[in-house]
Regions:
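Catalytic PLP-binding core of fold-type I/II PLP enzymes
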Residues: 1-15
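Active-site PLP attachment segment
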Residues: 23-58
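Active-site C-terminal subdomain of aminotransferase-like
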Residues: 54-74
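Structural signature of PLP-dependent enzymes
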Residues: 60-63, 84-106
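Conserved glycine-rich beta-strand-loop-beta hairpin in the small C-terminal domain of fold type I
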Residues: 79, 95-106, 118-132, 142-144
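Short, conserved charged micro-motifs
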Residues: 136-142, 180-185
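PLP-dependent enzyme catalytic core of the Aspartate aminotransferase-like
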Residues: 148, 164-195
Length: 195
């Protein structure tokens, strides 16, 4: 079986959502899991799992003892929120908010001296975008230099299985709810590293 964690799938800013692997699974070999912690509030702690029919009986017989830690009230409230269409409207509002944040942050990067040696890729991003910096530094050196300045940086090569050199110098910038003050610190640290 394949376990598909479709975390953050709701926040695609451009075009239709990318279909889940589970939605294309003709052999019923994908277990689909997701959570409402990013779309609602982390303290809600409600997740869900879609099992292939073949696994349902086995799941029920082995997990029957499990006592759910989420209150029934929260579960019923979430179910009503979904059934009455409020969740979809909530997601649309979040997407508009995140789109505004992304545009503001990209504007700040474009006004920075860093823009002379970098390019932003944001077409299909959710709550992140890619910043490709033309540099001779390795991704390990970039991460180390950023950490020395109190910044945690993810590089695209960390998410790749092979040919990581092809993705050298591409930073994954996560931006949800990032204050301007924090962003200025991040941009300043990146300018120190690359300029």
């Amino acid at each position: 079986y394949i376990v598909e964690d479709d975390f953050d799938c709701e926040f695609r800013m451009v075009g239709k959502p990318i279909p889940s692997v589970q939605s294309m699974d003709r052999n019923h070999r994908v277990i689909y899991i997701n959570t409402f912690s990013k779309t609602m509030v982390p303290s809600l702690r409600i997740g869900y799992m879609v099992l292939p029919e073949k696994l349902m009986e086995r799941y029920i017989s082995t997990m029957n003892f499990y006592s759910c830690t989420v209150s029934g009230f929260e579960q019923y409230a979430m179910a009503a929120f979904l059934e009455q269409g409020y969740f979809e409207r909530h997601i649309r509002r979040l997407i508009n908010d995140y789109r505004g944040q992304r545009e503001r942050i990209c504007r700040m990067f474009r006004k920075s001296p860093l823009s002379r040696i970098s390019q932003i890729y944001q077409d299909d991003a959710g709550t992140h975008f890619l910043l490709h910096v033309r540099t001779d530094l390795s991704d390990v050196e970039i991460k180390w230099a950023a950490r020395q300045r109190g910044i945690l940086v993810n590089c695209l090569s960390e998410y790749c299985f092979a040919d990581t050199q092809k993705y050298r110098g591409i930073l994954v910038i996560h931006y949800s709810d990032m204050e301007d003050e924090v962003l200025q610190k991040v941009i300043g640290a990146l300018e120190e590293i690359f300029l």
